[in-house]
Amino acid sequence: MTQNSYKIPIQGMTCTGCEEHVTEALEQAGAKDVSADFRRGEAIFELSDDQIEKAKQNISAAGYQPGEEESQPSENSVDFNRDGDYDLLIIGSGGAAFSAAIKANENGAKVAMVERGTVGGTCVNIGCVPSKTMLRAGEINGLAQNNPFTGLQTSTGAADLAQLTEQKDGLVSQMRQEKYIDLIEEYGFDLIRGEASFIDDKTIQVNGQNITSKSFLIATGASPAVPEIPGMNEVDYLTSTSALELKEVPQRLAVIGSGYIAAELGQMFHNLGTEVTLMQRSERLFKTYDPEISEAIDESLTEQGLNLITGVTYQKVEQNGKSTSIYIEVNGQEQVIEADQVLVATGRKPNTETLNLESAGVKTGKKGEVLTNEYLQTSNNRIYAAGDVTLGPQFVYVAAYEGGIVANNALGLAKRKIDLRFVPGVTFTNPSIATVGLTEQQAKEKGYDVKTSVLPLDAVPRALVNHETTGVYKLVVNAQTQKLIGAHIVSENAGDVIYAATLAVQFGLTIEDLTDSFAPYLTMAEGLKLAALTFDKDVSKLSCCAG
């Protein structure tokens, strides 16, 4: 049997002794040239294909948790036997597309990218970058209007949304040029302008020209979805895209939706001076999160003055001149919400309508998403998909990760499976929400014996000195191993804290590991240690930094 090179992520290694145990376990399965690294949480070795499961069993028997194996490229460069005009043809030009193009180009492949609109995809053009800079502007304006400190007299005039939008557009243009457009020439792959449509599984047509490739990546992203509410198509509603192009601050804004886009943009406009009503069908915001998280952000947004309506049944929407009326029913009572603008933030739909995927034998799901396996292959094994078009976690860092996976798999550089178990997510409200790993409910559904700690934000010294104490830290732990399997935070700068929690979850740190570590005083990161201490102690009875 031929020996192949493998890499396996391994949880639970904490020292050089652990490396020795893992090495011994692998060698007992017949592995050669084993290199175990506890800092990286991985082992690389040579082994025949038929012994890989035995190797993983040995690792488990030694007390560690092996992940999915990845075959590693040989030391020889890949010899491309081109079957078409390109080795890899990418449809789309966002995070997944550029990651795949760069990886493929670095390994000698001939690559082309097809884009029908603006280069750069959602994140830099109409998503992360423009929304977060506008959120920051709103946050500063809101703090000037309502700061929590006595003795400070701060105020603000009317927000000039036209100037803010112009500044935002300048930033977007700069980042699009530097992080996307300039890289096309830097790496030397082809950019083809136009709409791509499959002719067959080897050919697409762009502007009437047929182009062939050995493999394809569909990375066309997603667009705002519009709910089926009577009258919605007859009113001038906003989406997350058009809301960021407004030149005047609306007096009244009604937001349909209960997710991160609804909360972020709703709070942004509130901070700029708009009267905001958030409406959602569910009984609570962020219904997929643990109740403590939903309750904390609900309390904070309500304290700030946003109007939240849950359990909504939408009856119809009507345009009345410059005003829009939303007819709803809540607990059997009919209401009418009047607004100058209506923002629809009810999710996103994949951009697959014009690709003619049937001609290439590519199957899609109920919402039009491209269906893929663990290698990101579609139902046609020469065609891959990555990023938002698959309706997986809709983060640019996930898309970029998946693009790299596709480049490896499509070009035969290494056979890699996707692993999305440890993807952190952040909602950039104030306070922000950050989460990684399993919720309490998810952990129970997976059969874990679960224990949790819930630390109110007023137990975190940084929150006290900020005079902003609405929030919570929640940790989810496997009671049998004491390992952290989930962390969920509502606090200022929660997104800056969650990376530490991500490493803790990914590499199997225990409660004791967290409580025995140093946490800088008067930082939000200290909340992680305090939440870990809460499993065994009442932290309100501890002096500063005592554990």
Swiss-Prot record:
Catalytic activity: Hg + NADP(+) + H(+) = Hg(2+) + NADPH
EC class: oxidoreductase
Subunit structure: Homodimer.
MF terms (GO), sorted A to Z: flavin adenine dinucleotide binding; mercury (II) reductase (NADP+) activity; mercury ion binding; NAD(P)H dehydrogenase (quinone) activity; NADP binding; oxidoreductase activity, acting on a sulfur group of donors, NAD(P) as acceptor
BP GO terms, sorted: detoxification of mercury ion
InterPro entries: FAD/NAD-bd_sf, FAD/NAD-binding_dom, FAD/NAD-linked_Rdtase_dimer_sf, Heavy-metal-associated_CS, HMA_dom, HMA_dom_sf, Mercury_reductase_MerA, Pyr_nuc-diS_OxRdtase
Protein species of origin: Staphylococcus aureus
Cofactor annotation: FAD
EC number: 1.16.1.1
Name used for this protein in its record: Mercuric reductase
Cofactor binding mode and count: Binds 1 FAD per subunit.
Note: The active site is a redox-active disulfide bond.
UniProt: FAD binding residues: 97, 117, 122, 132, 196, 388, 396
Pfam families: HMA, Pyr_redox_2, Pyr_redox_dim
Disulfides per UniProt: 123-128
Family annotation (PROSITE patterns): HMA_1, HMA_2, PYRIDINE_REDOX_1
